[in-house]
Amino acid sequence: FPWMEPEGRVTILRTPAGYGLNVHLDSTEDEIGTSQHKFRIVLNGNVDKLYFIDKHKNEVYIPDNYYTYVLDGSHPHALKPGTEEKVTLCIGAPWNGELTPDYTKLLENSLYNMKVSRPESLEDSWTDPFWKK
């Protein structure tokens, strides 16, 4: 991906049918509001099982046609169990590279864009012990 500086780590995430992920952050609390981007391409499976938590602690689901997206790993999110195995190409750990002109253009010209408010407080269980200090 020529717009990535530095290059992001590429992995394949496999989520078996009937499995999900609890609400979590992919960052420390100190990183909230910084560039914690995660680039995803869903190769197979239910797309609309991914959701974010808004300021009222509601679940805000992504549309079922968002097969390619960038998400903010510092925003609380989760995955409901799906009826199909989900296979996702993931770039980022999360990727927190430079906002290059090409990457900025990619974000600004995206066909899809979701703005989800952030919860005013975080649940302790949302932060993985790995990220806790």
Task: List each language-model region with its residue ranges.
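Conserved metal-binding segment of the jelly-roll/cupin
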Residues: 60-76
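Short, conserved beta-strand element in jelly-roll/cupin
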Residues: 14-16, 32-49, 92
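Signature of the catalytic double-stranded beta-helix
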Residues: 1-19, 25
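A short hydrophobic beta-strand segment most commonly corresponding to one strand
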Residues: 37-43, 68-72, 83-101
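Short beta-strand or tight-loop elements
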Residues: 8, 21, 37, 75
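A short beta-strand-loop-beta hairpin characteristic of the jelly-roll/cupin
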Residues: 42-64
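A short secondary-structure junction signal
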Residues: 22-26, 50-56, 81, 91, ...
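Long hydrophobic alpha-helical segments typical of transmembrane helices together
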Residues: 89, 93-133
